[in-house]
């Protein structure tokens, strides 16, 4: 008589705060233990809180009432400011709380006073963790968070008398007893490329565990699965030898994304004309789109088109120095090394700017091409503007598309999106890279289930 297969344990429940479109949740839902890759999810998002309507609609389209995967109950999506949110019944039973309090206040890209006000949102995260009392909490943020007053306040909250005194912070990877405080804090920085992302994106990841959790072992940060290629390494050196177990793989290059996108037609400059009613936000919103719908272009001015054409592989704004261009009657662009090309009767214009020409250092990524053979730079919310960073296609005369940015972040082809082009770009750029979220999920699963 066949022995019946034991019932799988109940999924580990997750509450996602400042959830955005659900990148962190997607990473957790994608995790499967080794040997159970074909089984159902082991993590289940029960609730999410997000104040942005389009992002909340996207979350609902993937994990709420409009989700395609019905193997798990729908997450409750709360569209409201977190300051006024009181944990709902399902949230009060979450095993894990994850979230990244809005990071713009900590970011070097935002030095406005309003950033300081947004930094206080981390206190709301602490308030909710103290109320829910999960087994594990995870805070994700930019690297500057580790030097902020808010981080030091967090360290105080886990001490006796603090709101989180029932918790202890997990030592960061590589921590040594001899580390200085500053050295220890730097170890909280994880690079998504070390965990299989095709993007070099460093994020502060701070994990806390409740002192009453009954586990056979301590929670540890996930081991890295990929390492940066040394300057002297070759592809051949990465090939495994028979009978010899290899260590981590080399960082994944962004090439796979562009090999994929070149097989898809670049369709127009707009999203499909589609709207849907999302009950969680009680509105008709643009969508529901899939990642496949996001491969559209832009309508750049002639100057931008000329710059895209003139910048070589691996190049950036510095390659525009001493370059001029003309626009033919048919709209064609010609590039010249002189302001007075012989036989040219159309107006000749300079490609660079005085500001760019006068600065040999800094902003090296401006108007830069992504490099083949390497991971992408960090995908931010305005990746569709090469003036903002290294966001030109590696070889084509255009910026990367929303599709390519989403795939660089690790979103699956069937991920569902709501909102305008700008809304979706913001959702993509603010998300936690999916492979990084999955790696963190693996460490939590090992702690709670093995």
Task: List where the protein language model places each region.
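Generic recognition of flexible, low-complexity loop/linker segments
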Residues: 2-4, 193-194, 363-368
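Core alpha/beta nucleotide-donor-binding catalytic domains of modification enzymes
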Residues: 2-136, 143-156
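Intrinsically disordered, low-complexity acidic Ser/Thr-rich regulatory segments
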Residues: 6-7, 41, 176-186, 355-362
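Extracellular structured ligand-interaction cores
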Residues: 11-14, 201-205, 374-376
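Short alpha-helical patches at coil-to-helix transitions and adjacent helical residues
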Residues: 21, 151, 203, 430-438
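A short, structural micro-pattern
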Residues: 43, 198-200, 373, 402
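Class I S-adenosyl-L-methionine
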Residues: 87-94, 106-353
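C-terminal target-recognition/interaction regions appended to catalytic cores
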Residues: 272-450
